Amino acid sequence: MGALLDILLVNTGDKYPAIFTDNIIHMLEKTGTKYDKIHIITDEQYEGVWNKLQLFRDFKKGPYLYLDLDVCIKGNIEHLQREELHILHAWWRTRHHTPLNSSIMSWSGDYSYYYKVFASNPEYYMLTYQGIDEFIYNLDKVVYKTYNPVCTSFNWHGFDEQWDVILFNQAYHKMTEYGPWSKYMLFDVEPNMDPITK
């Protein structure tokens, strides 16, 4: 049996209240997903999503599984562990500026290449690309692989319960409102309640 996963989360700035990190832990435990430790990056060194690149600077052993905070976990997700760096292929939408989605990533080993390139000229990369997905996709050196479809997007397909993971992404505020996802989450909401904001 291999080593247990370390779960990685990023919660910088004031976009997500602390309950969103607690919610991930709640869903992992509820689904019986086994892990060793949870690491949460809270140091806001850059703007918004660019802080996720700190993951590659700080975590060079593994195995790791990174999750965005705006996901609903319905089933055990240990099967998402990968040795080589894997990023989501956003099969659920048109390509836009990149076909990648970094809401879920897994790896073992040293992928600090991504952080080092970015840190060499962060202002340039933040102005040139809309986020780390486009940044990673456009680098000359390709050192990642993409998952086969392992999740879906609430924004594009609604709350499709056939998947173990549903991404909410820009609709993260819906997670704190009552819906079919509520039974999986920590947010204690009932029909006709106001959304949770703390």
PLM region descriptions:
Residues 34-42, 63-70, 84-89, 144, ...:
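Short, hydrophobic beta-strand segments that form beta-sheet elements in well-ordered domains
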Residues 108-198:
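Catalytic core and acceptor-binding pocket of nucleotide-sugar-dependent glycosyltransferases
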Residues 44-49, 94-95, 149-157:
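A short acidic, often aromatic-flanked loop/helix-cap motif at beta-alpha or helix-coil junctions
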Residues 1-49, 60, 169-198:
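N-terminal anchoring/stem segment of glycosyltransferases
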Residues 100-101, 162:
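A generic structural signal for well-ordered coil/turn residues at beta-strand boundaries
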Residues 48-99, 106-107:
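GT-A fold catalytic core of metal-dependent nucleotide-sugar glycosyltransferases
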Residues 22, 50, 54, 130-138:
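A structural signal for well-ordered alpha-helical segments within the folded catalytic domains
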Residues 39-45, 69-78, 148-152, 170:
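Short, polar loop motifs at secondary-structure junctions
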